[in-house]
UniProtKB/Swiss-Prot annotation:
Chief place where the protein resides: cytoplasm
Organism: Shewanella sp. (strain MR-4)
Protein name: Ribosomal RNA small subunit methyltransferase H
Biological classification of the source: Bacteria, Pseudomonadati, Pseudomonadota, Gammaproteobacteria, Alteromonadales
Pfam family, one: Methyltransf_5
One GO BP annotation of this record: rRNA base methylation
A GO CC term assigned to this protein in UniProt: cytoplasm
UniProt xrefs under InterPro entries: RsmH, SAM-dep_MeTrfase_MraW_recog, SAM-dependent_MTases_sf
Function: Specifically methylates the N4 position of cytidine in position 1402 (C1402) of 16S rRNA.
Keywords: Cytoplasm, Methyltransferase, rRNA processing, S-adenosyl-L-methionine, Transferase
């Protein structure tokens, strides 16, 4: 792998440690990326263990060839939202000992201008995690209604100036279509008055478009529900989020399945019956990166790790 696009896995020890790996366990790395977490899992697995990695980025599939000679490893080209389907095809539902998810965009994707994820590097306005299929960011911006753009910017980017930015994009695109990341970033920088300190004005809009183009939050919802289906009793869920939208979904999911079903007050029901509706147990509190890790890898700053265990009921 090129050093230019090298990737440092965030919260590596904590995330893999949270899986509580067994020698002969079966694990899923739902976001293979460049293999940092997978490598750590394989180092802890015994010879009878198994790791199933998933990624929809063709470059990640290419990077997975580094483990081609390891019989314990296999890679699946697809989105992690479909992990339950892949596990079912393998006949392993209820036998998975741990699921790891490292959400968001990877450093190699950000650093490669040709992928179109970064407003700091000029490149084609693409933003697809799987650049072999689907609509690009440029294609969406060329056709989207003002209301649709404003909704995406507000909902997925928490952008305060969503409507104003959407109107300006619509006004400009008829004269000059937005085909490059620099075109879009420069427009947003030019029209944004109240700029946030230490944050590029295009940050929230780029995040919003990326999330929308790749259906990222839907993928997370599907992956969490799928993980609950495939995990064995005492199986672990270890998830890294990078912004509040992701972490909110993960936190609420763990809380909902840790508390069990809500029961109307006064209904004659035993504690044992309530316990049987609980499917997860949160393991500790949310874990943040240390100051030392942030110093080594600035992109770790916003990361949050949450770990949960499948209950045996």
């Amino acid at each position: 792998m090129s050093q230019e696009f090298a990737h440092l896995s965030v919260l590596l020890e904590e995330t893999v440690g949270g899986l509580n790996i067994k020698d002969d366990g079966i694990y899923i790395d739902g976001t293979f990326g460049r293999g940092g977490h997978s490598r750590q899992v394989l180092q802890r697995l015994g010879e009878n263990g198994r790791l199933i990695a998933i990624d929809r980025d063709p470059q990640a599939i290419e990077a997975a060839k580094q483990f081609a000679d390891d019989p314990r490893f296999q890679i699946v080209h697809g989105g992690f939202g479909q992990l339950a389907d892949y596990v079912e095809e393998l006949g392993l539902v209820g036998k998975i000992d741990g699921v790891l998810l490292d959400l968001g965009v990877s450093s190699p994707q950000l650093d490669d201008a040709e992928r179109g994820f970064s407003f700091l590097r000029d490149g084609p306005l693409d933003m697809r995690m799987d650049n072999s299929q689907g609509e690009t960011a440029a294609q969406w911006l060329a056709r989207a209604e003002i209301e649709d753009m404003a909704w995406v910017f507000k909902t997925y980017g928490e952008e305060k100036n969503a409507r104003h930015i959407a109107r300006c994009i619509a006004a400009d695109r008829d004269k000059t279509p937005f085909l490059r990341t620099k075109d879009l970033a420069d427009l947003i920088a030019r029209i944004t008055k109240n700029k946030e300190r230490n944050k590029h004005p295009a940050t929230r809009v780029f995040q919003a478009i990326r999330i929308y183009i790749n259906s990222e939050l839907d993928q997370i919802d599907q992956a969490l529900e799928g993980a609950l289906t495939v995990l064995a009793p005492q199986g672990r869920l270890s998830i890294i989020s990078f912004h509040s939208l992701e972490d909110r979904i993960v936190k609420r999911f763990i809380r909902r399945h840790s508390q069990g079903e809500s029961v109307p007050h006064g209904l004659p029901i035993t504690e044992d019956q309530i316990n049987k509706s609980r499917k997860l147990r949160a393991i500790g509190k949310a874990i943040m990166p240390s100051d030392e890790e942030i110093e080594r890898n600035a992109r770790a700053r916003s990361s949050v790790l949450r770990i949960a265990e499948r209950l045996d009921y």
